[in-house]
Amino acid sequence: MKKRKTGFLRALALMLIAMFTLSGCKDETSAAMNGLSIENNIAYDYVLSSSLSTAKGFAADLAVSESGSSNTDDGAVSASAALLVDITDGKIVYQKNPHLKLYPASTTKILTGLVALENADLSQVAAIDESIRIDEDNVWICDFRVGDVVTLEQALYGAIVNSGNDAAIIVATTVAGSISSFADMMNERAFELGATNSHFVNPHGLTNEQHYTTAYDLYLIFNEAIKNAEFVKIASTVKYTTSFTRGKYTIVPTWTNGNQFINGSVAAPNGMSVICGKTGYTEAAGYCLVILSESQTTGHRFISIILNAQSRDKLYNQMSYLLEKASYQ
């Protein structure tokens, strides 16, 4: 695939920041996250959300939630942030703290998938080096190893369907040569989409104080990702079986989608169909979920997001609440 080209992004960001500084506008400079505070250290990531119409790639049909806009929260959602957008009408139906900076956990892999699909051929042989090793306990992996012969497509299914953090690293190093170079691509693409309150340092979403996003930025990123048919195909896959070589052996893993709406563990409310989505969890991020759904009555499509729910049960209960609200639209 032809690689995307960027160049004027940082200059544009600095110009916008200067404009807002002169006019006296203020952005949120930090967000409390489980006792941590994320400060605005990187200039181009902090253009006000109300300036999104000036960012490259910002479309007129996107729902706009300006910084400081009031919540429609009715107390039913206890998660730190939530957002429900009718993407057919470009209308925000429900929002709670849409611009609060939070850890995204594996919802990061939405952007990882988008960048990979836009910049690489899925059939190419993936690059697996020592960077695949993750020095953390209790990290979900596909158990790829140095020397395995896999394609980028297999790694991407491993990253999105199985949420394997090692698979996400393979995607990054295959597409960009290194994790840091891929993170640069992620940040540039996010900025193009108007996701200016986010910053990414890795392709998997494991906790780092400099790796964060907002519910609204995730909406912008996911809204772009679902325009890619291959992304929707991967993110809607219930179960994926593949095979690859490891020395003289053939490895045949089967991965099941952890999204309980996709794998059938949780039923969507009456009148709603869940199409695809991405889960996320770390201790710092809490339970996270991004969903594309459709009303069986009106045909309207919705993006719904929950960030930092306190438990898996609460995550799915609160997401079901958003989907039920969508069914009434």
Residue positions per predicted region:
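Active-site-adjacent loops and short helices of periplasmic peptidoglycan-processing enzymes
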Residues: 28-216, 225-229
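Bacterial N-terminal signal peptides that target proteins for export
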Residues: 2-12
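Domain-terminus/edge residues, biased toward the C-terminal soluble/receptor-binding domains
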Residues: 26-28, 195-196, 209-212, 216-217, ...
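Membrane-anchoring helices that localize proteins to membranes
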Residues: 13-14, 25-27
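Alpha-helical transmembrane segments
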Residues: 15-19
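Alpha-helical transmembrane segments of integral membrane proteins
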Residues: 9-10, 153, 232
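C-terminal motif of bacterial Sec signal peptides marking the signal peptidase cleavage site
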Residues: 20-24
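Hydrophobic alpha-helical transmembrane segments of integral membrane proteins
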Residues: 11-14, 106, 273
